[in-house]
Amino acid sequence: NAQYNKNPTILNHVQWFQPSLGWSSGPTALRMACEKGFKHIYILGFDYQGHVVNPNTKAAKLNNIFGDTRNYKKRTDEATFYGNWMNQTKRCLADFKEIKFYRVCPEGAFKPKDLEWNENLGHMNTKEFVELFKLTQRPT
């Protein structure tokens, strides 16, 4: 990216994974939180499948806050297959067994069977998360 050449010293403050993981942004953020030594990590925004628009075919549309922005898919586009994100999440769960992970998602949300093997992952609905941390939730 030519923008990095405008101020090359900015990259002096970047901590690169060694070796490079080549991961997506969400699992990379999860990995960074793991490496900080937290005992409990709450995972938000990992829906894995997007918004299901047809329960019969399980067709799903993009569900991402960056949808319709520059260099990103349209909100009307089909959801991206979540296999890579799933594998990257599973790697974090396996590599950091001492951490308790809580995946926060709406009531009745998709729960991937691929994550159920792990004893250090639990699911929490959004209401429980809001109550646990005494947060104020804006109306949708």
Where do the protein language model's features map onto the residues?
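Metal-ion/cofactor- or nucleotide/acyl-coenzyme-handling active-site neighborhoods
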Residues: 1-140
